[in-house]
C-alpha cells in the first residue's frame, strides 16, 4: 500500500487531477488524419514524466486496437512516433514486445537516447547491441 500511495501521490495535486479528468487530445483521431502531437516535459523535474509514459502507452494500445477493429489491421494514415529523450519518460509496459508488433499496423517508433547504456537501463535490451550512430 505504501508503494501504491507513493505512486499515486502526484494525483493529490488538483491541477493534475483536472487535466486527467477529461479528454481534449482526441488521441482516437490519430491514424485517421495527418496529425502532429508534441509532448513536452521538464528536463529538470521528473515528477510528471509518468504522465508522458501513460499517454504513450495508451496511444500505442489505442492505435493497435483501432487498426485491428476498424481498419482490418492497418491504419489508413501511417503514425510515426519520434520519442526524443525516451529514457527519461519512464517505462512503457512491454515496449520491447510492442515495437515488434506495431509495424504491421502502420505504426513506427523511433526512440532517441543519449547512450547505448540507456537501452539496458530502460529494459529494451538485455545485452549489448550494435547501434547506428551519427
Where are these regions (language model features)?
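Conserved ATP-driven motor cores of ASCE-family P-loop NTPases powering translocation/secretion/packaging/pilus
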Residues: 98-134
Amino acid at each position: 500500500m505504501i508503494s501504491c500511495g507513493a505512486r499515486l501521490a502526484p494525483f493529490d495535486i488538483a491541477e493534475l487531477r483536472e487535466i486527467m479528468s477529461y479528454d481534449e487530445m482526441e488521441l482516437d483521431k490519430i491514424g485517421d488524419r495527418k496529425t502532429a502531437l508534441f509532448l513536452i516535459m521538464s528536463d529538470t523535474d521528473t515528477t510528471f514524466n509518468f504522465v508522458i509514459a501513460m499517454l504513450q502507452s495508451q496511444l500505442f494500445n489505442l492505435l493497435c486496437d483501432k487498426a485491428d477493429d476498424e481498419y482490418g489491421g492497418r491504419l489508413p494514415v501511417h503514425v510515426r512516433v519520434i520519442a526524443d529523450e525516451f529514457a527519461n519518460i519512464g517505462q512503457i509496459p512491454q515496449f520491447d514486445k510492442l515495437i515488434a508488433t506495431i509495424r504491421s499496423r502502420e505504426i513506427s517508433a523511433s526512440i532517441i537516447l543519449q547512450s547505448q547504456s540507456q537501452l539496458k537501463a530502460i529494459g529494451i535490451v538485455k545485452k549489448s547491441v550494435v547501434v547506428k550512430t551519427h
